[in-house]
Swiss-Prot record:
Chief subcellular location: secreted
Disulfide bonds: C2-C18, C3-C14, C8-C17
Organism: Conus textile
Name this polypeptide is given: Conotoxin 5
Gene Ontology terms: cellular component: extracellular region
Domains as described in the record: The cysteine framework is III (CC-C-C-CC).
Gene Ontology terms, MF aspect: toxin activity
Tissues and organs where the protein is expressed, per its UniProt entry: Expressed by the venom duct.
Subcellular location per the Swiss-Prot or TrEMBL entry: Secreted
Entry keyword set: Disulfide bond, Secreted, Toxin
Amino acid sequence: GCCHPSTCHVRKGCSRCCS
């Protein structure tokens, strides 16, 4: 799934950032 832009670079479980 996608992660919030603020935590995208921090969370390893996300495949991409949410726009």
